[in-house]
Amino acid sequence: MAISIKSPKEIKALRKAGELTAQALALLEREVRPGVSLLELDKMAEDFIKSSHARPAFKGLYGFPNSVCMSLNEVVIHGIPTDYVLQEGDIIGLDLGVEVDGYYGDSALTLPIGAISPQDEKLLACSKESLMHAISSIRVGMHFKELSQILEGAITERGFVPLKGFCGHGIGKKPHEEPEIPNYLEKGVKANSGPKIKEGMVFCLEPMVCQKQGEPKILADKWSVVSVDGLNTSHHEHTIAIVGNKAVILTER
């Protein structure tokens, strides 16, 4: 399937969705603390999104039961909010999407709950810094596979490994569109192959970072994804548009 090119009008609509996504995440960032349950946070985000005349994009998507993916400690993505109460030393990944007038925004971040270990601090910094490094490297005409190679290099040079089998993606009138953008260069694939980045494209980059092994395992809830190493993980994501031959973050907080 071809990668869609968005018109200026569509990018304006996607910017609106992205801004609301960022506002919802910023709300959660302010409210995350020891003593708060995951379900309380999920309700805060859902209430805010609905009060803004928008729809939580993840609720019901592929059957997901909640508005926010909340990935605790070793869970890297797709964690389901529960009545678990956050404790000092936890890390929590928050990934949410918003639909506004038929257009989608998508963003994620991983946050410390109070004081965390030095290793977890490095882990959280890795996914955030790798994301921002990749965004700053985007040029019109480069291959998406080059972007995957850049993401992998940024992750591994910080001493970590990317999660395998899951990836960034295009976004627009659907929450997941072409292309798929892995956080690593697949075996046997050349960086200078495949589709190129063009003006008007909109897509999500989302480094998912593991400590020792990138092979995934899906837990019994059939949603939560962990590394087979069982160690803590981290995830950051932004929606990006190519406007004026440069990358513009639509979900900047």
Curated annotation (Swiss-Prot):
Keywords linked to the UniProt accession: Aminopeptidase, Hydrolase, Metal-binding, Protease
Catalytic reactions on record: Release of N-terminal amino acids, preferentially methionine, from peptides and arylamides
UniProt: a divalent metal cation 2 binding residues: D106, H169, E206, E237
Broad class of enzyme this protein falls into: hydrolase
SUPFAM superfamilies the UniProt entry points to: Creatinase/aminopeptidase (SSF55920)
GO biological process: proteolysis
Residues that coordinate or bind substrate: H78, H176
Protein name per the record: Methionine aminopeptidase
NCBIfam families per UniProt: met_pdase_I
Pfam families tied to this protein: Peptidase_M24
Coiled coil segments of this chain: none
Family (UniProt): Belongs to the peptidase M24A family. Methionine aminopeptidase type 1 subfamily.
Residues binding a divalent metal cation 1, per UniProt: D95, D106, E237
Subunit structure: Monomer.
EC number: 3.4.11.18
Function: Removes the N-terminal methionine from nascent proteins. The N-terminal methionine is often cleaved when the second residue in the primary sequence is small and uncharged (Met-Ala-, Cys, Gly, Pro, Ser, Thr, or Val). Requires deformylation of the N(alpha)-formylated initiator methionine before it can be hydrolyzed.
Cofactor stoichiometry and binding remark: Binds 2 divalent metal cations per subunit. Has a high-affinity and a low affinity metal-binding site. The true nature of the physiological cofactor is under debate. The enzyme is active with cobalt, zinc, manganese or divalent iron ions. Most likely, methionine aminopeptidases function as mononuclear Fe(2+)-metalloproteases under physiological conditions, and the catalytically relevant metal-binding site has been assigned to the histidine-containing high-affinity site.
Cofactor(s) the protein needs: Co(2+); Zn(2+); Mn(2+); Fe(2+)
